Design a protein with these regions (language model features):
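Bacterial N-terminal signal peptides
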Residues: 8-16
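A domain-start/cap signature at the N-terminus of enzymes
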Residues: 20-51, 63-77, 81, 107, ...
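Structural cue for short, hydrophobic secondary-structure segments
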Residues: 54-57, 84, 265
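Active-site glycine-rich loops that stabilize anionic/oxyanionic intermediates
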Residues: 57-61, 269
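Cap/lid segment of the alpha/beta-hydrolase catalytic domain
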Residues: 86-110, 170-171, 175
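A conserved short beta-strand
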Residues: 153-164
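Short beta-strand/loop motif that positions the catalytic acidic residue
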Residues: 208-210, 214
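Conserved alpha/beta-hydrolase "acid-adjacent" motif
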Residues: 216-221, 274
């Protein structure tokens, strides 16, 4: 009887997963694809005003992450579109985005260029007015890259268990950055970013997430990332620290008293994206999807005003 029950549960889980993935359509003909990435998307029948880009972590399937994190359910609930760039095994044996490779992180080259072309193509196809980006781990590092290379494309972003860009220029410095934080100072990161975008005045809103026990990507990366982005955004006021049971949120406000940058530190959790299965579209526990008082997807969508 127990074996039969487990088989039924497994069957239902697989069926639900395939059902969720069936919501996505392949994105074809999005222009040049120098990074040789795949892409799929979800959109409601009605025209979507917003497009959210999700960049998965290593060894993950982007569509499954969208479903398990609660982001797909939120897209259906709030009526925004989802774009899922997908790494291919032939590009990286662990299916990580190559965020540390000069061939892929440089503006208008490799994977960075491919993702930009996906965004602009789908944005035109769907008629979306605004674009947002969220990434987990290696996808978080790539999201950092996209926000720096193409800040004009995005209203806002979220980097979860990731690192700031530019932090690494090869695999060795990439590993060092993951374990020890950036070798650059906050001021140097700001200067490098401004030099890449000399005409950019306004920067995307940013939400940065880490678990305080993350032993894969040092939490120091998130702290530095938030401080660097606040300085990049010309924020002069002191940050506000909000301590809650199980997490701490530090917020930096711009001159209009709007939160421009936030750092969410979840106490005693490791490497992953936070989910709260107890709330609607709060996500479900799995590998690198960690039960928490907060749902990252739910919180970020609210933070962005979607």
């Amino acid at each position: 009887m127990q074996i039969l029950t487990r088989l039924i549960v497994s069957f239902l889980t697989i069926s639900l997963s395939f059902s969720a993935l069936a919501n996505f359509k392949e994105l074809q003909h999005f222009g040049q694809n120098p990074g040789d990435l795949g892409a799929s998307y979800f959109a409601t029948q009605a025209q979507s005003k917003a497009l959210v880009v999700l960049l998965h972590g290593c060894a993950q399937h982007g569509e499954q992450l969208a479903q398990q994190s609660g982001l797909l359910g939120l897209a259906k609930e709030h009526g925004f579109a989802l774009l899922i760039p997908q790494q291919r095994l032939m590009n990286n044996i662990k299916r990580c985005f190559n965020w540390y490779s000069d061939d892929d992180y440089t503006k208008d080259k490799g994977e960075s260029s491919s993702i930009k072309n996906m965004i602009t193509t789908l944005q035109k196809q769907l008629g979306t007015e605004s674009v947002y980006i969220i990434g987990l781990s290696g996808g978080g590092a790539m999201a950092s890259n996209m926000l720096v290379n193409y800040p004009y494309l995005f209203e806002a972003g979220a980097v979860v268990a990731g690192i700031p860009f530019p932090c690494a220029d090869d695999l060795i410095t990439g590993i060092s950055c993951m374990k020890n934080g950036p070798s650059q100072t906050i001021e140097e990161l700001v200067s490098l970013t401004r030099n890449l975008n000399p005409k950019q005045k306004n920067w995307p809103q940013l939400s940065v997430w880490t678990g305080t026990k993350d032993n894969i990507v040092a939490p120091l990366n998130s702290s530095i990332h938030a401080q660097y982005w606040a300085q990049l955004s010309h924020i002069k006021t002191k940050a506000n620290v909000d301590k809650q049971e199980g997490y701490v949120i530090t917020r930096w406000q711009n001159a209009a008293k709007e939160v421009q940058v936030e750092l969410v530190e979840v106490i005693e959790l490791g490497h992953g994206i936070m989910v709260n299965p107890n709330i609607k579209n709060g996500g479900e526990e799995s590998d690198y999807l960690l039960a928490s008082p907060l749902s990252t997807a739910q919180h970020v969508i609210n933070f962005w005003g979607l």
